[in-house]
């Protein structure tokens, strides 16, 4: 069973969070996503890690983890259950 690790992650300001959400939406649409993300999409800090959660009308469309060193986004195949809430 994996051990939960906590990494130091600085919460982004409003402009950085908006840019990260925009980049996640672009990545979602370029990957072939057909549903459009809703305004409920946004930044989530979970157990010390930063995530961008894209919500759709039917639920969570995708979750992207934010690397703390260069703010690169990585799409998660399986995301933590607490990120959805």
Specify the residue positions occupied by each region the protein language model found:
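Short, non-transmembrane alpha-helical segments in secretory-pathway proteins
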Residues: 2-38
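Extended aliphatic helical segments
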Residues: 21, 26, 53, 60-63, ...
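Exposed beta-strand-loop-beta-strand "reactive/processing" segments of non-cytosolic proteins
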Residues: 32-68, 72
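A short, surface-exposed interaction/processing loop segment used at functional sites
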Residues: 65-85
């Amino acid at each position: 069973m994996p051990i939960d690790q906590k990494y130091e992650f600085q919460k982004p300001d409003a402009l950085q969070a908006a840019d990260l959400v925009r980049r996640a939406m672009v990545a979602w649409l370029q990957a072939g996503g057909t549903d459009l993300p809703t305004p409920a999409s946004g930044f989530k800090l979970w157990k010390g890690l930063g995530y961008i959660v894209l919500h759709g009308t039917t639920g969570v469309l995708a979750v992207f983890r934010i690397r703390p060193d260069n703010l690169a986004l990585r799409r998660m195949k399986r995301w933590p259950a607490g990120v959805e809430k």
